[in-house]
């Protein structure tokens, strides 16, 4: 036990240090980028030290609790804590943000504002994953949008304003449902708002009301995940954003939707979850195949990778809807795995653009001989994305696959149909990924497009990709590097929905 407010320090340190950026000397980006990288690295070291020394993997309850009254009249507390659902995502946030800051080295336009926004986004994401108060969760959910919008609208492609506006409209629209859901959940059956996650988890609601609350939360999280049909902001956003911003979007922001769905919908509203679970499984399976087909039709490199993200996040829906411990644990691992893989692919897409000034696949070709290191790294990351054995994606998708197959909540016919659809999606994944690699690095050279900067990957790029590949391979070879972080918690959450799920499987959803 410790009385030191470690989590408050971890959450507030990046944005607090970022406020000092305007005081840094010089107009160039040399000092500010080293300063921002140092802040991210120090925060990553701090969280690693704190979790290593003070977090006990075998303890199920929330640990490192902090509770400070913020707005007394609303009973609004600065309430932080860490458990199995959040610790892995907090570490992922620190790791990916540090590498994204290093990836943003070439940014030269208004670097002070750029790096401050990255640090502010960093604090917002850490605060969301560490929140143990549902109103604080909402505040962090909203505050994190501001730096994302500015990063999208000020640094990116020609249609960046359109993409940023579409992003903010989708997410703000989803936030309305999130706010309505949390107000209803916190005020129901009490004279004062109940905002503590731990207390809310013991509240009960009439089933009809619980379903309405669940639906409001589901819409908000489906936008961020993203889930079909609320996914259309993602390809536009990734297509226009700077690749360091894309690393943060794919690596962390999408995981906010999956985390909120498991933390709130499953843990606080288990009865409603059993009602929606079959539909979530069906939606996730459809999304895996649909996004894979649409990805194959994309001719823009970043849009193809964006749709691959939509496809891979479908496994999170299937795992959460499987109502099994194995499936839910696989969904958690899928979020970690995709955070690493998505960040690596968008980084490679951006560094390729820096050299060629094109993202159109039809204008690429025969780059393998010119950039052999880039070719090797791109191919390796594509293999990780298509769930090659020995990579983290293989383990996570296999866990979701078997979690659905072995789920006692559904009939054999329903499980067989979903498994078949998932298998089709798994087969489609190498088709669009390997064709992408072929168009970029094989074939004939397009005469109208040449490599402007005919320099292969440098030490900085090799370091960023190597750092992302190490945990992908490590988890793929030995999954217990990551699984113990959340295994006890996912078992507890799955146990909340399994008893009632058996009843529902025998009545409403027993498809014969």
UniProtKB/Swiss-Prot annotation:
Subcellular location: Plastid, Chloroplast thylakoid membrane
Gene of this entry: ndhD
One GO BP annotation of this record: ATP synthesis coupled electron transport
Transmembrane regions listed in the UniProt entry: 4-24, 34-54, 87-107, 111-131, 134-154, 167-187, 208-228, 242-262, 274-294, 308-328, 330-350, 374-396, 417-437, 462-482
Catalysed reactions listed for this entry: a plastoquinone + NADH + (n+1) H(+)(in) = a plastoquinol + NAD(+) + n H(+)(out); a plastoquinone + NADPH + (n+1) H(+)(in) = a plastoquinol + NADP(+) + n H(+)(out)
Annotated InterPro entries: NADH_Q_OxRdtase_chain4 (IPR022997), NADH_Q_OxRdtase_chainM/4 (IPR010227), NADH_UbQ_OxRdtase (IPR003918), ND/Mrp_TM (IPR001750)
Upper lineage: Eukaryota, Viridiplantae, Streptophyta, Zygnematophyceae, Zygnematophycidae
Keywords for this protein: Chloroplast, Membrane, NAD, NADP, Plastid, Plastoquinone, Quinone, Thylakoid, Translocase, Transmembrane, Transmembrane helix
GO molecular function, one term: NADH dehydrogenase (ubiquinone) activity
The protein's name in its UniProt record: NAD(P)H-quinone oxidoreductase chain 4, chloroplastic
Membrane topology: Multi-pass membrane protein
Record EC number: 7.1.1.-
Similarity field: Belongs to the complex I subunit 4 family.
One term under GO cellular component: chloroplast thylakoid membrane
Xref: Pfam families: Proton_antipo_M
Native organism: Zygnema circumcarinatum (Green alga)
Keyword Flavoprotein carried by entry: no
């Amino acid at each position: 036990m410790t009385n030191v407010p470690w989590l408050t320090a971890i959450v507030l340190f990046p944005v607090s240090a970022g406020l000092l950026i305007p005081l840094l000397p010089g107009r160039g980006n040399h000092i500010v980028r080293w300063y921002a990288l140092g802040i991210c690295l120090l925060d990553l070291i701090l969280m690693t030290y704190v979790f290593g020394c003070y977090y006990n993997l075998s303890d199920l309850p929330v640990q490192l609790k902090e509770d400070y009254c913020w707005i007394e009249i609303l009973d609004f507390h600065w309430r932080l804590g860490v458990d199995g659902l959040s610790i892995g995502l907090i570490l992922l946030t620190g790791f990916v943000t540090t590498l994204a800051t290093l990836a943003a080295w070439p940014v030269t336009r208004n670097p002070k504002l750029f790096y401050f926004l990255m640090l502010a986004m960093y604090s917002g994401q850490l605060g969301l994953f560490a929140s143990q108060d549902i109103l604080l969760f909402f505040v962090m959910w909203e505050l994190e949008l501001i730096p994302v919008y500015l990063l999208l609208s000020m640094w990116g492609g020609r249609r960046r304003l359109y993409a940023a506006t579409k992003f903010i409209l989708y997410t703000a629209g989803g936030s309305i449902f999130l706010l309505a859901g949390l107000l209803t959940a916190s005020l129901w059956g009490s004279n004062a708002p109940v905002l503590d996650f731990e207390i809310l988890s013991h509240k009960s609601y009439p089933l009809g009301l619980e379903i309405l609350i669940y639906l409001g939360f589901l819409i908000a999280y489906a936008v961020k995940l993203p889930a079909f049909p609320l996914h259309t902001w993602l390809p536009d956003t990734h297509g226009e954003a700077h690749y360091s911003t894309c690393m943060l979007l794919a690596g962390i922001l999408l995981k906010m939707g999956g985390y909120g769905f498991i933390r709130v919908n499953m843990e606080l509203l288990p009865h409603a979850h059993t009602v929606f679970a079959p539909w979530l499984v069906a939606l996730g399976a459809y999304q895996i195949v649909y996004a894979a087909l649409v990805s194959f039709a994309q001719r823009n490199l970043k849009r193809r990778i964006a749709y691959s993200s939509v496809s891979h996040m479908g496994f999170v829906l299937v795992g959460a809807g499987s109502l099994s411990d194995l499936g839910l644990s696989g969904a958690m691992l899928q979020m970690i795995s995709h955070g690493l893989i998505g960040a690596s692919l968008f980084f490679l897409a951006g560094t390729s653009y820096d050299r060629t000034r094109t993202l159109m696949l039809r204008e690429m070709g025969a780059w393998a001989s010119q950039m052999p290191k880039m070719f090797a790294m791109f191919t390796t990351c594509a293999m990780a994305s298509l769930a090659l054995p020995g990579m983290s994606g293989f383990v996570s998708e296999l866990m979701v696959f078997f979690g659905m197959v072995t789920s006692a909540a559904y009939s054999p016919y329903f499980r067989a149909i979903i498994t078949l659809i998932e298998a089709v999606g798994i087969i489609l994944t190498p088709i669009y990924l390997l064709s992408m690699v072929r168009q970029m690095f094989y074939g004939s050279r397009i005469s109208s497009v040449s490599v402007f900067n005919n320099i292969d990957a440098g030490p900085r790029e090799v370091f960023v990709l190597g750092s992302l590949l190490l945990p992908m391979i490590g988890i793929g070879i030995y999954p217990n590097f990551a699984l113990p972080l959340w295994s006890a918690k996912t078992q507890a959450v799955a146990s909340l929905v399994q008893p009632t799920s058996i009843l529902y499987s025998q009545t409403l959803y027993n498809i014969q």
